[in-house]
Structure formats: structure tokens, C-alpha cells
Curated annotation (Swiss-Prot):
Signal sequence extent: none
Alphabetically ordered keywords of this record: ATP-binding, Ligase, Metal-binding, Nucleotide-binding, Queuosine biosynthesis, Zinc
Residues the entry annotates as binding ATP: L8, S9, G10, G11, L12, D13, S14, A15, T16, V17, L18
Annotated gene: queC
Protein name, per record: 7-cyano-7-deazaguanine synthase
Amino acid sequence: MVKAVVLLSGGLDSATVLAIARQQGYECYALSVSYGQRHGAELAAAKNLARSLGATAHKIIQVDLSTFGGSALIDKEREIPTDGVTPGIPSTYVPARNTIMLSIALAWAEVLGSGDIFIGVNAIDYSGYPDCRPEYIEAFETMANVATKAGIEGTRLAIHAPLMNLSKAEIIKRGGVLGVDYSMTVSCYQADDAGLACGVCDSCRLRRAGFESADVPDVTRYHAGFRQTPAS
């Protein structure tokens, strides 16, 4: 069986990607990164999802980006925006996060003898992050094939982004067919330690709208004080 490293945050998108990679016949090695995010619920969800979705192994790597700050996701002094998606790069963008995660995944893939890395970036229902675009993935793949022993020796490395051109509704439908239990996932930027979602941050809004558009019941676990209304 061909091995693949799958970046697994614990959220809806990455869980779907793990299910897709498994469905495609890969032996999946799930990789999560503790980068100084506000809560541990996402990583706890990743552990459970790796087990539920049949990953062969799961590693959590520590890289504390909160030392630098620069993002509302890792700096608790900055507020998480709750006014909906706005033009431009949002304050929740974490500088170089995907580049760092993909680099770590690349290192593990080389050790495993794997030529395949999966990541759940999306260019349709995304929040304006520059490292979620097709040209970014293409550029990283080019770099990977120049900068690694495997690439130089002729084993081509591929970065798979199967959600790139899917809407959130399409992602949810795809995951549903593959048996992903979305109640196990945590997408909220400011979830509590139990993984309960705020319902109003950009990530929650996109997720809620996705369930609505897919006409699928929203199984997200919200804070008791959140009154669910149409997201669209």
C-alpha cells in the first residue's frame, strides 16, 4: 500500500481529506501541529479523528508560533473577528503556517519513503489566506522536488489538495458519503476546551453556511448561549 502523510488539524476540511486519502487506497500517516493555537480542543479532535478514520499513525509536532505573534489565532490579546468575512487578509491569518506544516510533513514523508502529502486547503469558501491558493500549492510542490533527496533521485513528490475547488457544501457532502462524523471535528477559532463552538467567528460562519447549503443537519456542538439562526 502506498504511504501518504495527511495534515490533520482536527477540523472539518482536514478530516474530509483524511477520509478521501483512505478511500483512494493510501496508508495514511496523520500529522498535526501544535503551533500555539488558542485551545487544545482541535488537537484532541485530531487524535480521535485519526483513530476513527483509520490512520496508520498519528504524530503531533510542537512548533510554538505564538512566540512571534502576528495573528489573532495565536495572540490572546487580539480579538477574533466576528463580523463575517471581509475583503483582504484577515487577522486570523497565521504567518507562514501552511509552509511550516507542509515542510514538517515533507520531512516525515521522506523518512517514510512517501511521495504523497495531503492538505485540506480550499480556494472557494476560504477566508482570504494567501497560502490556501492553487499557485501556493504548486509553488511548494516545485520547491519540494528541488529541495529533497527524493526529488533529486527522481522520486517525484506530490502535494494533494483535493478540496481546492470544492465549496464547503460540496466538502460536507463528500465527507458524508465517506462516513466522516463531523460532530467529532472542531473548526471554531475560539472553541472552549470541550470543543464547543462560538457560532459567530469566520470559520463557524463558513461551516454553518456549508451545512445549510448542503441541506445536511448541522451536528456542530455550540456553546449553550449561541442561538442558531440562518448563516446565509
